[in-house]
Amino acid sequence: VLDVTAFTTSDLRRRALPLARFLVPWAVLPTELEAASAPVMPPEIAGSDWGRGRTIFFGQEARCGQCHTVKGSGGRIGPDLSNLVERDVASVVRDLREPSATIHPDHLTYVVALKDGRQLTGTVRTEGDALVIGDLEGRLTRIGRDEVEEMQALATSTMPEGLIEPLGPDGLRDLLKFLLIPSQDDAR
């Protein structure tokens, strides 16, 4: 227990020292806090282009934005990727290269057999008395629950493997910068 008190020559009663006037050697100063809270540029993506990464995400090159949301923009089939800024480069690269390695329970892929003989594959969410199935092309199909014959969960992600391969190393680094750095201002 740390007991910090003070007194003066005119008043010898011991009084607690106000914390605002007490600076311990291990205290983090406000300027250090500001520096610590500034985004750190991972060396793997240094020199890449945040704006090009955004274009890759929302464009036809990687088509990420068809299924995924970042900061309110994009599709609603796959997980919202806004919180990737809290993750490390290696784990994000693994998830991009091996989308079935870890699948969020809310985004499991299902094969849905309908009573009319059709079969739909994708992520499933409920909206009232309906199911909304999102496929790998980014399309949403709304069906009534009473139309479903059977649903079976798959062990594979709706996101196909190999989507990032055509980007090459520079395109992948640009995409990673967009996903891992909160804003273009922080990317500089």
Label for each model-derived stretch:
Residues 32, 67-69, 106-111:
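Short coil/turn segments at secondary-structure boundaries
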Residues 93-102, 106-112, 116, 168, ...:
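Short glycine-rich, low-complexity segments
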Residues 73-98, 109-154:
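Gly/Gly-Pro-rich "capping" loops immediately C-terminal to redox-active cysteine motifs
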Residues 60-71, 81, 175-182:
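The canonical Cys-X-X-Cys-His
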Residues 28-59, 89, 115-117, 161-164, ...:
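Electrostatic cytochrome c docking/interface patches
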Residues 45-48, 76, 154, 158:
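Alpha-helix N-cap/N′ positions at the starts of helices
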Residues 12, 19-26, 118-120, 124-130, ...:
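C-terminal capping alpha-helices of c-type cytochrome domains
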Residues 2, 6-46:
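Long amphipathic alpha-helical scaffold segments
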